[in-house]
Each structure stands twice: as structure tokens, then as C-alpha cells.
A protein has these predicted regions:
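Membrane-proximal basic amphipathic "stem/tether" segments
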Residues: 1-28, 428-500
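Cysteine-centered catalytic environments shared across enzyme families
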Residues: 1-263
Length: 500
């Protein structure tokens, strides 16, 4: 099998779609301008290996997606990252196998759409928090099913038969120094890969920093490897006490860029729709404010450090099963594809060795870096303190950036957290879609009955009351989140259709 390429300068620069006809032997790739395309492989990503060899399918740390094919082989291998934050999406129709790193691209190309009477999309898209073995692998459409491929190498034959091969990367980690050295070595190789002269685009380096553990530790690791630009929110009031300016200065960063966490609300480009289409109903859209800074860059983040670096994560496992679903999706792939940004969550590098990382975190050598309490992460604390940052300067109160729409009770209540352009678009969409009203109201009633404790506890928190009631462990997509995802996907499909 062999690749044939068609560049489309109008689609997001890192997006691609592969089309395989039954028994044809040709894999047609439609791709954006910065997808790296060669005879035997194509890739939108970076890894800890030599770029020209294209061996990202066996990498210890791959960030992005791509495909590998040999002309004398009867199958092609499509590759996902060594974590669950990105997926590949496929479907078979009319004796053709279609696969893409963009769900809206796949739907726009195939002519399919989401089902407006299905309310589980938030759960399905964010089930990555349940790990590689428990996550949802099929996405219901109006008249079809999309397969979601995560944390695997996907082999597809010329007869359109496919099989997922689970990732199998392993490293041995016994001590803190083992972990620190392997992380630094892996990051160095990734950065070398990203700056290879044979690439169409050599990527810059940008990190995020705050007074929390995860972003600070990530920034401590990448500074010595050439990263000198750090982003942080310093306003409005919510972010003042979490500003990472002081931490960045102590770590040695020279180019420190401060932003306003609410500046995204001035956008007219439907950033919220772009984010929602991937299942992220809030959380990361605030970072879009910095998009021109991290354009054409590797963007280092501290996402999932609360689990991978958490001292009390006794259920640590190799499958990235975070046991319970987060209220924040922590993924924004459509934005990164458009902006030619490769997001790298530093805690997820070697994250498949979570059990070993947990043992190191709780070992005797780390005791002096444990400060006690619920917010206690010895590994990131040691990484930062060894760079000369005083203990009292960070890691004592969890703030977190962003927000979530999912607990908003009404469409009108979303308005205060969304740009006017996006809100008006969402409002118009909500009026245009046709839904089974009886089914909708039944779902809404069930949702609020099940999640009453969550809303009650929120009110108690606002009243500064210590009284709480136990919340349900059963996750259920919120009605507002479901609407946001439908709207976001509809807008992104329109964007792709216009481009193709």
C-alpha cells in the first residue's frame, strides 16, 4: 500500500484525512499545510526519535497522529499518541475506509452529522478519563457509527479490515533521579525532533506557569532544554494569586507574557464552538488568548499532573484510568490543529509508568518534599525547589485556570462566560434544531435528580457552609454540555465543508 497526497491550504494546518478504497492499494491523504508527508509516512506530531526515520509507532513518547505504510505491505498503520488526550476517528462507507485526526473533518467529508436527540456526547468524548480499557470506543451519529481509536496503533488492510494494537512502551523507574533523567532525556529528544531541519516547520517552545505544582514543574523541566517563553494569567482578580510571574523569573525565564483570563470573551471567531466540538465545555478556551504566542510551537502544559503526580493516587495504573471523570475535558484539538500547535502535557510523558511514579512519590527519599494535606505532590515540588524556587512560593493552594459550562442551569446563564458572537450563534442554533421534546424533558429531569447533590453543595460553598451531601459517582452528560457540543460540531463541520 502507498500514500498519495493532496494538500489543502484552507483546512487547519495540522489536520488530515485518509481515504482507502477496498482492494485499491492507494491511501489518499488530504492534509493541511504543516502535515509532514513522505513516501512511507506522514505525521502531525513530534516524538522522542530521529525525525527522518519516521518510527513514531514504536516511540516511548509520541504527541500527535500519523500513518506509516510500506509499498510491499498489504496494510497501513495509523498511530495515536502515547496518551489519551487525542484520538483518531474512523468509519466505513461505500467500500471506503475513512479516518481522520479531526472528528468534524471526518463528518464534513462523509456527509454525516451528530444526532440531536442523543444526549451522551459529553460522556462519550470525555470517557478518556476512564482509561484505555474503559473508554467509549463508538460514537453514535444520526445514521452511522464512528469508531474512536485511542492509545493504540491501528492496522488497516487493503480489504478494509482493521485491528487495534495496544501501546506497549515501557521504561524502568525506581528512584526520583531515574524519573527526572528519563523525563529530561525524553523531552530533549522530542525538542530535537521538533526542530529537525528536514521538517517543513521547526517548532518554537512555549510553556505555561502558575503558582500550582504541575505547570511549575513542567516549566522547570523544559527551561534547561531551551524553552524561554512562559505564559501566565495575572488578571482578573480570580487569577491574581495564581500568577506565575515570580515562579517563571526564579526559574530563569526571560520572556514572560501575562494575560487576562477573561480576554477570550472578546473573540469573534467562535473559539467556544471550536473547543466544544471536541467535548471541552469550558476549561481550555481561556488559553486561546495566547494563541498568537504559541502558534507554530510546542506548548508545554501541566494537565493531569493532579493524578500522575498525586501522592494519594493509590489506584495508579498503566491504562490512564483516572477512575472518575473530570468536569473539564482538558483537550482542545481543533484549536491546536488550526493554530499549528502541538500541545504536550508534561505529566503524561512516561505516564504509562504511573504505578512506578506513585511508588517514587511515596518513597522515603521524597519525605522531605512532602508538605502534607490534600494538595501534596512531592515529585513536582522537588523538581521546582531544586531549581532554586523557595518552598513558600508555590504549591500550597490549588487554583486552576479556566471554568466549565456544564453546571450552568440554563442557556441564558452561559452568556456571562461566553463571547457575545458565540452566544448569539449558540442561541440561533438552539432555536433551529429539532428535538423530541418529551425525550428531552425526561432527560433533563433525570439529570437534575441525579445531580441535585452537586448543585446543593455548590450553593453551600457559596454560603461558606461546611454542610455537604454525598454526590453520585455515576457520570451523566449535562443538557447544556450536550447542546454546546452539538452547536460546536455544527460550526466546525460548516468550517470544513467550506474548505473542502
Amino acid at each position: 500500500m502507498r500514500f498519495e497526497y493532496q494538500k489543502n491550504e484552507s483546512i487547519p494546518s495540522l489536520s488530515w484525512l485518509a481515504e482507502i478504497s477496498k482492494r485499491g492499494g492507494i491511501i489518499n491523504i488530504t492534509h493541511g499545510t504543516t502535515v509532514e508527508c513522505y513516501e512511507n509516512f506522514f505525521v502531525s506530531g513530534v516524538w522522542d526519535g530521529e525525525f527522518e526515520k519516521g518510527e513514531f509507532d514504536t516511540a516511548l513518547s509520541f504527541h500527535g497522529t500519523g500513518g506509516i505504510a510500506l509499498e510491499d505491505s498489504d496494510f497501513v498503520t495509523f498511530v495515536t499518541p502515547n496518551h489519551l488526550q487525542e484520538s483518531l476517528y474512523s468509519l466505513v462507507q461505500n467500500d471506503e475506509f475513512l479516518i481522520s485526526n479531526s472528528l468534524p473533518f471526518l463528518l464534513a467529508y462523509s456527509g454525516h452529522q451528530l444526532d440531536t436527540n442523543y444526549y451522551g456526547y459529553e460522556y462519550d468524548l470525555n470517557s478518556i478519563f476512564f482509561g484505555s480499557k474503559r473508554c467509549v470506543k463508538e460514537l453514535k451519529l444520526k445514521n452511522a457509527i464512528v469508531q474512536m481509536h485511542r492509545y493504540c496503533n491501528l492496522k488497516v488492510s487493503c480489504n478494509l479490515l482493521w485491528k487495534e494494537i495496544p501501546k506497549s512502551a515501557k521504561v524502568e523507574l525506581r528512584t526520583f533521579n531515574d524519573y527526572k533523567l528519563k523525563m529530561s532525556e525524553t523531552l530533549h529528544k522530542i525538542i530535537s525532533n521538533a526542530s529537525d531541519a528536514k521538517r517543513k516547520c521547526q517548532y518554537n517552545l512555549v510553556t505555561t506557569v502558575s503558582k500550582g505544582y504541575d505547570a511549575s514543574a513542567s516549566s522547570a523541566l523544559v527551561h534547561d532544554l531551551g524553552c524561554n517563553t512562559a505564559l501566565t494569567f495575572s488578571s482578573p482578580e480570580k487569577y491574581v494569586n495564581d500568577s506565575g510571574v515570580e515562579i517563571a523569573q526564579l526559574l530563569g525565564y526571560k520572556n514572560i507574557i501575562e494575560g487576562n483570563g477573561c480576554a477570550y470573551m472578546n473573540n469573534t471567531a467562535l473559539w467556544e464552538a471550536e473547543s466544544a466540538s471536541c467535548g471541552d465545555v469550558g476549561c481550555l478556551v481561556a488559553f486561546n488568548t495566547f494563541e498568537q504566542v504559541y502558534k507554530d510551537s510546542l506548548l508545554f502544559l501541566g494537565l493531569k499532573g493532579d493524578s500522575i503526580w498525586g501522592k494519594d493516587e493509590s489506584l495508579a495504573n498503566r491504562n490512564f484510568d483516572f477512575i472518575k471523570m473530570s468536569i473539564a475535558a482538558e483537550q482542545n484539538p481543533e484549536h491546536y490543529l488550526r493554530n499549528n500547535t502541538i500541545a504536550i502535557s508534561v505529566p503524561l510523558i512516561l505516564g504509562y509508568e504511573w504505578p512506578s511514579i506513585y511508588e517514587i512519590n511515596n518513597s522515603s527519599e521524597m519525605e522531605k518534599y512532602s508538605v502534607g494535606g490534600e494538595y501534596d505532590r512531592p515529585i513536582p515540588r522537588r523538581l521546582v525547589e531544586e531549581k532554586g524556587v523557595p518552598r513558600k512560593a508555590f504549591g500550597f493552594k490549588k487554583h486552576g485556570a479556566g471554568f466549565t459550562y456544564r453546571f450552568q442551569p440554563t442557556l441564558k446563564s452561559v452568556k456571562s462566560k461566553m463571547s457575545l458572537t458565540s452566544y448569539n450563534s449558540l442561541l440561533d442554533y438552539s432555536k433551529s434544531i429539532k428535538r423530541n421534546r418529551l425525550k428531552y424533558y425526561a432527560y433533563v429531569c433525570k439529570y437534575y435528580m441525579k445531580n441535585f447533590p452537586t448543585y446543593f453543595n455548590y450553593v453551600m460553598h457559596r454560603l461558606h457552609s461546611p454542610f455537604k451531601i454525598k454526590c453520585t459517582s455515576k457520570y451523566m452528560s449535562s443538557p447544556i454540555a450536550s447542546l454546546l457540543i452539538l452547536w460546536g460540531m455544527n460550526e466546525m463541520i460548516k468550517r470544513y465543508k467550506k474548505a473542502i
